[in-house]
Amino acid sequence: MIDENFKKKLAVSRERVEDLFYFENSKEIGRGTYGLVYKAVPKHSNGRFPNKEYALKMIEGQGFSMSACREIALFRELRHPNLICLQRVFLTNEKKVWLLLDYAEHDLWHVIKHHRTAKTKKVPIMVPRNMVKNILFQILSGMHYLHSNWVLHRDLKPANILLMGDGGPDMRGRVKIADLGFSRIFANPLKPMAELDPVVVTFWYRAPELLLGAKHYTKAIDVWAIGCIFAELLTAEPLFFCKEEDIKAQNPYHYDQVKRIFHLLGYPSDTDWPDMKKMPDHQRLLNDARNEGTPIQTFPNSLQRYFDKWKINSQSSPYRLLVKLLTVDPLKRVSCEEAMNDIYFRKMERPPRETDDVFNRYPIPYAKKEQQITIPIDQFQQQQQQQQQQQQQQQQQQQQQQQQQMQQPQIGPPQMMGQPQMGQPQMGQPQMGQPQMGQPQMGQPQMVPSQMGQPPMGGPHPGVVAPDGHAHQMMQQQHQSQHHMQYQQMHDSMQGGMDDGGPQAKMMRMGNVPVGRYGPMGPPYGPQDFHAPQGPPMMQMMPQPGPSGYYQQRPGQPPGPGPQGYMNPQMGMTMGMRPQGVPQQAYMPGRGMPPPQGPNPQQQQQWQQYHR
């Protein structure tokens, strides 16, 4: 037992992180396996901490967890030019653990994203080939050091590969491997690795033996992840992209991910991987493929065809090294040391070194992490709460308006809010028997609907009152459109894109607009009948710019602010294409007809008289 007086003296003398460092706007610059990472600078230049930028990682939870102990112990023992350096450990009186690490301005995730974004904008700027070589060599060098000391990283991915910026000339452009939260010593383990941690490595970088439930695994799982990162550097897209709907599952098996791997590399034969049939989840894989109707056992190797579109020849040295790194049999997979001696690196003018500047002394074109997070976390959370409150208030107002209009008996057709009732025409407003908007007569100028007042999201105008029985349907359509937008933005933000640029690339080619997943895609990527002009030439609608984030009109795309791919079965035309002043549910092309459900026979007769 520790003496209480000693504990009190220790608490008084213990240094607080807040007293030693400035946190720049409390901005989170990263997230590790078990904690958040913040950027900090020393408050006092007294020589204890050099006046430079640091990364402070706060371990989540109370006290020392086993993962935190492992990470701290490994960081204190391991020293290599390509490993992030741990400067100091702080333990606060609130039992919070802080790790003071070297600060890296960039990481491979943002570097690859930068080039992928340029590609989707049809400005193909790929990662320079010499830069790819230097990055790969330094990753292999750092991992060879870990493996030589019997340490598995087990969470290699682009976000955990850091690049030093302009902080110092001796460290500029150096690769640093970070986040040892999943790392383990694999020399003579007391238990199988799979029993200690059943799920390791992010899906896209997970080796096939892990996906098939191997109980024992080796350093080959890190080599596979390096191969996936190498392919992503060459193409700016994840090689084995797959949805991660069960990322928190306790079982490492993932059918879609295994299918994606075998779709590119081919289904292994008994010669390619003799032990595959011994994997615990091999039979489960075959059962899932049989239930899905997928002939997974007949998949050929299509990796060469995949890289042909990136102009990477199958006889080139990078392709040959990639095949060695992505060998499905872990016993035949190349080691980090063997990969460092590959001809791919020997063909350089001078051999690469672990301390080289991967930017080759050129200006760094990538944004820093703190520039990509423009506002503090607390302010961002406040803005999110305000937006949610505003949305709730708008929904409540719309519901109240719709309830009030439903309670009032309607004699004529639904009216726009703020417009005169039937029998009370104003100057400039069409009266009974006069042509409505969008129905010009001979000799009369064409009337173009105003851009203001068009329904957002392709849903009903907030001032339009639906016929009886259709208010619930209008609300449901609006809620569904909002849900699709939110889901599309949340899901596609995680997706790096695959083959033709992925969902993000398609969104940017179409004007940076999320496209509905559950309806046909708009032209030029969908049916051309949606693209046909609506009505005679003199009655076509003018293009509507819509709010920010919607379509920017281009040739070959239909106008209107509504999302493409959603059709109203009662309208027969794309949302946002009806004449102004006529409710969505009541409009049919050619003539205004009542919807098949809703109004009673008396109201239907009044509707027909009104639209004659």
From Swiss-Prot:
Q: Which GO terms describe its biological process?
A: G1/S transition of mitotic cell cycle; protein phosphorylation
Q: Please name the PROSITE patterns in this protein's record.
A: PROTEIN_KINASE_ATP, PROTEIN_KINASE_DOM, PROTEIN_KINASE_ST
Q: What is its EC number?
A: 2.7.11.22, 2.7.11.23
Annotated residues for binding of ATP: I29, G30, R31, G32, T33, Y34, G35, L36, V37, K57
Q: What positions does the domain Protein kinase occupy?
A: 23-345
According to the UniProt record, one GO cellular component term is: nucleus
User: Which reaction equations make up its catalytic activity?
Assistant: L-seryl-[protein] + ATP = O-phospho-L-seryl-[protein] + ADP + H(+); L-threonyl-[protein] + ATP = O-phospho-L-threonyl-[protein] + ADP + H(+); [DNA-directed RNA polymerase] + ATP = phospho-[DNA-directed RNA polymerase] + ADP + H(+)
Question: Which UniProt key words apply to this protein?
Answer: Activator, ATP-binding, Kinase, Nucleotide-binding, Nucleus, Repressor, Serine/threonine-protein kinase, Transcription, Transcription regulation, Transferase
Region (Disordered) location: 403-483, 543-612
Residue numbers annotated as active site: D155
Report the principal subcellular site: nucleus
Here the segments flagged for biased composition (Low complexity) are 403-455, 472-483, 543-555, 564-573, 600-612
Subunit arrangement?
Component of the Mediator complex.
Q: Which family does it belong to?
A: Belongs to the protein kinase superfamily. CMGC Ser/Thr protein kinase family. CDC2/CDKX subfamily.
What is the name of the protein in this document?
Cyclin-dependent kinase 8
Q: Which gene encodes it?
A: cdk-8
